[in-house]
Design a protein with these regions (language model features):
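A glycine-rich phosphate-binding loop feature that marks nucleotide/adenosyl-phosphate handling sites
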Residues: 180, 224-231
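Short gly/pro-enriched beta-turn/loop segments at secondary-structure junctions
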Residues: 216, 220-225
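Intrinsically disordered, low-complexity terminal tails
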Residues: 1-60, 358-367
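Short alpha-helical segments and helix-capping/turn motifs at coil-helix boundaries
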Residues: 71, 126, 213, 328-330
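Short, solvent-exposed loop/turn segments at the edges of secondary structure
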Residues: 134-138, 223, 339
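Alpha-helical scaffold segments that mediate packing/assembly in large oligomeric complexes
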Residues: 139, 143-158, 162-217
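Sequence/fold signature of self-assembling virion shell proteins
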Residues: 191, 197, 205-209, 226, ...
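Assembly/oligomerization interface modules of large self-assembling protein complexes
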Residues: 57-137
Length: 367
């Protein structure tokens, strides 16, 4: 099980778990567990197998092994850098109640001239409110006691990676669903959509439209697109647009049919983001839709949050419901009473909301 051992030995991204119910020798016990799993002492195969089998029946090993799995999931989860993190604002909430985000605009409009002995005009302000709530997501899996015994824990070697991928995919789906063809965010009244395929001309229109957005007092908000998000089907088109030095456009009938000119879009510093979930979430325009986003540090179109203290996927193990005939406790690795299966569960708490429509723009051929 080299994959499992590699993850065990990779302590990058390690975050100490809660110290509740951990003895003062906990870290030493955890190290001994890792040494046993990885055979750090280079024991002969038959002795290593014997010690593993013995460990499965002890009371400490199941919990320590579960902690190892938990840390592996964290390492695998943090090793992935989802593309959506570039164009959304990230935060935390303290509970499952609806959290409110307020955006105050105004108060910074131009100063009005004040006549001699005249009154100063009041500074007008406007307030926008957004509701953000997180939800709980998860799955459980079970492994038969026989499999654990026969496979020397090899059956669990890719479990951390699978759980980490599941968490990453869940977050990605949620984020993409927030903006993909969002009929509330993208409207003609908002001036942030166009029913045109991705071209240099349509991208110029999008950039100009975002730059022209104003606040409630018709003051410019100095808005500028930083990211262009496309599905895999448009990646090559987007790259060609962003790297081409020249473009060709048609002139009037009296002049030449077409002539080259500079492609200024390539000079705008847009960052290309390819979202593979766009065609999955948006079955209508997912292959042809394209999006622009401002820098979320300036103006956020989307905000996502984890539950505070639970910013990563978490694994827990089901305690055994069996006891010995004499009434003694049996460790979780012995499985449940009915089937002898050993149960694990992964949990993720996550949520998001769309915020300022002026921080994004949508284009597509079938809008």
């Amino acid at each position: 099980m080299p994959e499992l051992m590699k993850l065990i030995e990779d302590w990058n991204g390690y975050v100490a778990l809660s110290d509740v119910n951990k003895g003062e020798n906990y870290e030493q016990q955890l190290k001994e567990t890792i040494d046993l799993l990885s055979n750090a002492n280079h024991l002969p195969p038959h002795k290593h197998e014997y010690l593993l089998r013995e460990a499965l029946t002890t009371s400490d090993f199941p919990y320590l092994f579960g902690d190892v799995l938990d840390r592996q999931v964290l390492a695998s989860y943090k090793a992935v850098d989802p593309v959506w993190k570039q164009f959304v604002k990230m935060s935390t909430v303290k509970d499952f109640k609806t959290a409110y985000r307020f955006a105050i605009t105004g108060g910074d409009q131009y100063l009005a001239e004040v006549a001699e002995k005249g009154e100063y005009l009041a500074s007008e302000r406007d307030e926008a409110k957004y509701e953000l709530a997180v939800k709980k997501y998860g799955r459980q899996f079970d492994i038969s006691w026989e499999t654990l015994i026969n496979d020397d824990l090899g059956a669990l070697k890719d479990t951390p990676e699978r759980f980490a991928r599941a968490a990453v995919r869940t977050e990605h789906r949620i984020v993409t669903a927030l903006y993909a063809r969002n009929a509330v965010t993208y409207t003609a009244a908002h001036g942030n959509m166009v029913a045109t395929a991705l071209t240099i001309a349509s991208l110029e229109t999008g950039l100009e439209s975002m730059a022209a957005q104003t606040d409630a007092n018709t003051e410019p908000i100095m808005n500028r697109a930083k990211f262009i998000v496309v599905p895999p089907a448009l990646e090559m088109t987007a790259r060609q647009i962003l790297t081409s030095a020249t473009k060709v456009w048609s002139d009037n009938a009296a002049g030449p049919a077409a002539y080259p000119t500079n492609n200024v879009v390539a000079q705008m510093g847009l960052t290309l983001v390819v979202d593979p979930y766009l065609p999955i979430i948006d079955t209508t325009d997912g292959a042809t839709g394209w999006y622009l986003f401002s820098d979320p540090k300036d103006i956020a179109a989307i905000e996502v949050a984890h539950l505070s203290g639970h910013e990563r996927p978490e694994i827990c193990m089901k305690a055994s419901d069996k006891v010995t005939v004499g009434g003694g406790a049996i460790g979780p690795m012995s499985g449940d009473f009915a089937t002898d299966n050993v149960f694990y569960r992964v949990r993720l708490v996550f949520g998001g909301v769309t915020e300022d429509y002026r921080a994004t723009y949508m284009g597509g051929s079938t809008l």
